Amino acid sequence: MKHSKKIIFALLALAMSNTSMAAPMPLDRVSVQINDGIILESEITNMVSTVKANAKAANQTLPSDDALRTQVIERLILTHLQMQMAERIGLQIGDLQLDQTIENIAKEQKVTVAQMQQTIESEGTSFSQYREQLRQEVTLGEIQRIQVQRRIQVSPQEISGLVKLIQEQGLKDVEFQIGHILIEVPSNPTSEQLEGASRRAEIVLKRLNNGDDFRSTAIASSSGPKALEGGIWDFMNINEMPTLFAEVISNAKKGDIIGPIKSGSGFHIIKVVDTRGLQTQEVEEVKSRHILLKPSPILSEDRAKAMLANFLAQVRAGDADFAKLATQYSEDPGSAAKGGELGWADPSMYVPEFTQTLASLQEGQYSEPFRTTHGWHVVQLESRRKTDATEQFNSNRAHQLIFRRKFNEELQNWLDEMRSEAYIEIVEPESKRG
């Protein structure tokens, strides 16, 4: 896994992992009811303990136990709601797809699966526990993609407008790492509530300007989506980030703290944690063709994989034509009619597993069957070429940037809607009851 991804996992993902892996406490109780599901006190306790341990190892200051507990409960609530949604629509990550994901992670780390397993177990986690946590992470990613993607529309006018801007900027990309703190206000707030939130935001801003640690302050004070990660968003192009960020940081420099900025959800404080510039010169494109089979109640995962393996054997033996097989069997409507041809494309435009597989192939080589979010594939890399960034590339890039920005915004809207429609009851410990 790339270094940046490891950083993202440092507090939250590792905490979630250890939460699900820890042995049950001898005495436990229901701390939160979410629809027909529950969060046990042991889940909260284990996650809080892990966050504290990770913070101590990183020499990071944490807020009060109550503030940290609130953030942990909120994250667990959102996780459980998403997993409940996945269960309702029948979304399951099978072992074959999980194995493929683990193989891809090992390739990114340039190790074998056995070496990766040895490293994980040396850190005190069984490989079976790691697999189940990874299964949950993949499920969360899938349910977010399924539910949020259909809410997003990118118009030709938006694309052409951004293409023009990109061309005016000479394809110069600058990425920002943003720190974000949200002092939330309720729906339809009173003037007193607005004034109170505004005062709290000014106090937080003053503390930050006086040198308080941003991450610790965010964990203690923020109601934003990245609060438990210290309010830190990963590097984003200005066209990818939420509109609120983009409107205020275009002229900011590293270290600047901006705010408070009022919106419908509250008062925002934004810090430019870091910046980096990207210079694009030549772009490598690939020409490929593939066959896609989608598992279903009729076609099992094993059967789909076996069919593709059989197709490959026939093609390699000269007994079948790849293009004809693609036309007859492929379930990708966009390419099946063209014999599976995907044409020339920037490989980063594909889903990660597809991109990684193409990167591992020589020209003319066929892949073995592999799994992506779309189903099971075999792909042939026909050719590679270096090309300047063309107008079509700019258009694809513009669509990608706009989509990512809207995805980030719609993801938070979807989570908020799910939470507002759910039955949630937080049961306080007896020691805190009046």
Swiss-Prot record:
Catalytic activity as recorded in UniProt: [protein]-peptidylproline (omega=180) = [protein]-peptidylproline (omega=0)
Cell compartment(s), UniProt: Periplasm
Coiled-coil annotated residue ranges, if any: none
EC main group: isomerase
EC number: 5.2.1.8
GO terms assigned for molecular function: peptide binding; peptidyl-prolyl cis-trans isomerase activity; unfolded protein binding
Domain of life: Bacteria
Any one GO CC term of the record: outer membrane-bounded periplasmic space
Principal location: periplasm
Pfam families reported in the protein's UniProt record: Rotamase, SurA_N
Function statement: Chaperone involved in the correct folding and assembly of outer membrane proteins. Recognizes specific patterns of aromatic residues and the orientation of their side chains, which are found more frequently in integral outer membrane proteins. May act in both early periplasmic and late outer membrane-associated steps of protein maturation.
Entry protein name: Chaperone SurA
Species this protein is from: Shewanella frigidimarina (strain NCIMB 400)
Organism lineage: Bacteria, Pseudomonadati, Pseudomonadota, Gammaproteobacteria, Alteromonadales
